[in-house]
Amino acid sequence: MVQSEYDVVTHFETLYQRADAEFAFEAETREAWLAWQSAFRSRLREALGLDIIAANLEGYVPAAEQVGREDRGDHVRESWRLWVEPTVPLPFYLLRPKSPPTSGDLPLVLTPHGHGRPYMYVGIFHTEEERKKLEVGERDIAVQAVRQGYLALAPTTRAFGDTRTVADKEADRIHSCRTQLVRDLLVGRTPIGDRVWDISRLIDWALKALPVDADRIAITGNSGGGTVSLFAAACDTRIGVAVPSSYFCTFTGSIGAMRHCGCNYVPGILRMGEMYDVAGLIAPRPFCAIAGEEDPIFPIEHAREAFSHLKRVYEVAGVPERCQLYVGDGGHRYYKDGAWPFVRRYFDVLIS
């Protein structure tokens, strides 16, 4: 039907319906599921720009430098930089438990942050507003991890902190995501791809430099950190447990329905699959999506819809119990009660 007046919602909902996703999950057997994963993961890596980065940096080995150390009582907080690209010294924090519950290699948890200050995930705040945001939203995620007895890596998300533009640093803007997006697009890359690349290089480094149990690697972060958690686990199968918070939803019901930061977007993603299809690349590894009942930007009804689709992937994989949705009673924030019991359960299984 031809409309007499333009309506932006109707127009784009029509486009979404016509996207005809190539990798919409339809497998009924284990063999078909594995073939779907292999083909989709390869295509997703290409779309994110990971293949371009890998080709441009073939043979490159990142160097690391420690720049600080502080005793925090029950753990040690170290500051590091890792040259994830020759032109990108990426800051990150390493938190080490002083009294781990077991001897030998330790589990590793990566805690990518979202649209906030990188230091908040390690419990640092500089203003009363930051303190309240950290405490109410349970955003000291790396500290939570190290207090579970795990090694924790809290990287700066690309386009934040020291990886902002000079102008954004001078103006004390939180991020430079738009600059990252538009310049990445010129060379076939994406901010999500950059951030997934960084996570994989941190895992490379940790496995060589730290006493890490390679079978017990988890990733969890809130909002934009949930984005990185989901896509990194979809692309890098070394990540054994994925717990994205305040992100898992449908693309059409969240970033396709309201204003979101440009760093969330991957060109043509709906022609490949919905968010639950991307998350399906994590199966059979344990996956728990944390959501807020009152989250205004990743609405719970669309999170539940996405979860119903994702459960089907885990059913075909033969492990439906490994796919969970935890719903907190608040808004867009982290809910630690949805994270650590789930992580512990599967870390314990992996050593039993």
Residue ranges and their predicted role:
Residues 221-231:
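Glycine-rich nucleophile elbow surrounding the catalytic serine of serine-hydrolase chemistry
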Residues 1-76, 84, 352:
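N-terminal targeting or regulatory segments adjacent to alpha/beta-hydrolase or S9 domains
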Residues 104, 110-208, 253-258:
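Cap/lid segment of the alpha/beta-hydrolase catalytic domain
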Residues 308-352:
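C-terminal catalytic histidine-bearing segment of alpha/beta-hydrolase fold enzymes
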Residues 67-130:
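Glycine-rich active-site/cofactor-binding loop and its immediate structural neighborhood
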Residues 211-223:
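Alpha/beta-hydrolase fold nucleophile elbow
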